[in-house]
Every structure is written in C-alpha cells, then in structure tokens.
Amino acid sequence: MNRTLLTQALIKFLAGILLIGLLVFLPAGSFAYWQGWLLMGVLFVPMFFAGIVMLAKSPDLLRKRLNAKEKEGEQKAVVALSGLLFTLSFVTAGLNWRFDWWILPDWTVWTAAALFILSYLLYAEVLRENEYLSRTIEVQEGQKVIDTGLYGIVRHPMYMATVIMFLSMPLVLGSPISFIIMLGYIPVIAKRIRNEEIVLSEGLDGYKEYMKSVKYKVIPFIW
C-alpha cells in the first residue's frame, strides 16, 4: 500500500469533513440540525469506501482525483466560482434552518438524499469506465476516447453525476433558498465543459468524431 497516497487521501478527507461541518453547523448555531448530519452521512460515508476501493485497486486514479490544481486561468476561475457557490449555499442553508425562513418538508429532504446517492452510483460507474478521469482538464499520455457505456449516451457523464449531486445537496439540507443559489452551478459547469471540449478536440485523437456521434453533453435529449 502506498502510504504517501494514503496520507494525502486521509488529510483531504478529514479536511473536507471539517470544512463542510463548519460551513453547515456554524451558521446553524446548533448540532441539532439533522439535515446537516444527513448530508454529512450521504456525502462522506460513500466517499470513504470509494477511497478505500480506489486505493486498493486503482491508486493512479485516486492520485488523479486528489490533484485539483488547474493550469489554465479560465479553469481556475471556474473552480473559484464553484467554491463561492458552495460556500454561499451551505452557509445560507444553516442560516435558513437557524431562523426558520423556508424549510422543506422531510419527504423532500429524503428524496433528495436518494437522488444524491444515485449520483454517487453514476459517479462510481464513470470512474470504472474511464481510467483517464482526472479533476483537472488535460490530455494524458496514451489517453483514448471512451465511447461506450455512459459515454455512449452523453459526452460528459461525470458532469451529469455532479449536476445531480450538487443540486440535490441544498435540498438534503432542507433549503430551497440554497437550491436557488446552487442553480448558478449550471452556467459555471457549462463554461468548464466548453473549455474542456476545446482542449480535448485539439489534443485527443478521435474526439472531434466522438462529438459528432454523441450529440448530448450532459443530459440526454436536453443538454
């Protein structure tokens, strides 16, 4: 087992728990915010087990997923905007619960939690299908176009999973106000996709043909 990789993964995992916990519970002013605990559970429990599986079976893939440093200025801006949206959404959700502004019914929260878990399953399938998947936009040595499985339906199934994941999170937190804020993620990710397709079409053999054969980017028949 790669102890360095394990250490890096654990540090990022624990830092993520601490960061999300602060963003959710500090504005809420209480640990009684059960929707916050639900989000922590559906977010970090599957993440923990996925990390163990990747560490054991696909350490190179885990290493790529841990690397979030973008090289291009445009993508750095996309990452910064995404971080701002997350911060505003989580803080607003905590304040929404604390001051009882507009709380969603429990059935909506649990339905959103189920959608979140579904998005994790989609994400796991994408990781299984594409060994070249990284968090940064780049063309890797020996990379090939993947056009089977989910990639035969949409060109960016990872973003299909993340759109479901990110839009369901504020609903898990019971905050429609946070959901409205998180809708800003759609134009942000659209900007990232445009840039990514430019990079791939210029640097990855066969990608232009793939774009012609698979029409939809993220959501079948819609986007």
Q: Predicted regions: what is each one?
A:
Residues 1-148, 160-223:
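Membrane-anchoring alpha-helices and their flanking helix-loop junctions
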Residues 152-160:
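Histidine-centered phosphotransfer motif of kinases
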